[in-house]
């Protein structure tokens, strides 16, 4: 069993291989272009070298980081899947929420004959600003998957408290399956979130159990979501590994939730971010705060005997 947190730059992609052999992918990002927020932060952090490069027409890529003195190798999630799981379908693709940095390159799955069997989505009527052809292609593929012509893939819009065969139940109804628990969204608060216009708070917050390792995947959930989880779960919010919400930004950090979760490892997908970076706050509650940008791909493996390891692509 394995959970891989891929170094995809600004965005997310988590690939989980369950004991059943089924494959879950949570979000995908195969775009090497920086979004506006990250672009501004890179300029601030690296100064003139990045700022001058960013003025070149069409240059908004992670090549900026190399030019500014940071050597980084991003992982193409499509190539990762083809190399590590050749010929294998994605049994369960979960779109945490409908922001482009969590779905860029989605159309490349179909282009490389990687089929999605079940497509998890959230209820919304959000449409992002589409500023380039790559964004348009990814969004159009997302809409195609949501429509699910002829039932392929099967579209599921789950919420807190739901149960179902394969993801948290065995075919005979016994609890288990692939060990996925939905902590959020909650149907009681979904309308309020939709009305607020804060798409980040539509995020699936999932607790996935691999062997006995409890992993919380928090999407881009912000304070209001964490308030609800703290109120509803209390000390039952415990986990071993947390994938930090909103790429480790302050907006996704919640002090009481961290105290209750008390993870051994916190994984941040992006890395150090001036002004908005909450890594120092996470370290108050977790000794091991690992960024994919500095550590590369981060992989948790475990087996039925209870043996577990967590390793990174780069030892730094």
Predicted regions, residues:
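Short acidic, glycine/proline-enriched helix-loop-strand junctions
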Residues: 127-158, 261, 276-298
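Metallo-beta-lactamase
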Residues: 89-101, 242-246
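Catalytic metal-binding/acid-base residues of hydrolase active sites
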Residues: 9, 29-31, 99, 125, ...
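Core dinuclear metal-dependent hydrolase active-site scaffold
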Residues: 1-88, 154-238, 296-316
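Extracytoplasmic/secreted cell-surface and envelope-processing proteins
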Residues: 101-105, 127-131, 135, 191, ...
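Short, surface-exposed basic-aromatic patches at helix termini and helix-loop junctions that form
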Residues: 107-116, 234-235, 258-261, 282-284
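Internal alpha/beta domain cores that form substrate/cofactor-binding pockets in large enzymes
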Residues: 239-304, 308-312
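Active-site HxH/HxHxD metal-binding segment of metal-dependent hydrolases
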Residues: 92, 100-149, 263
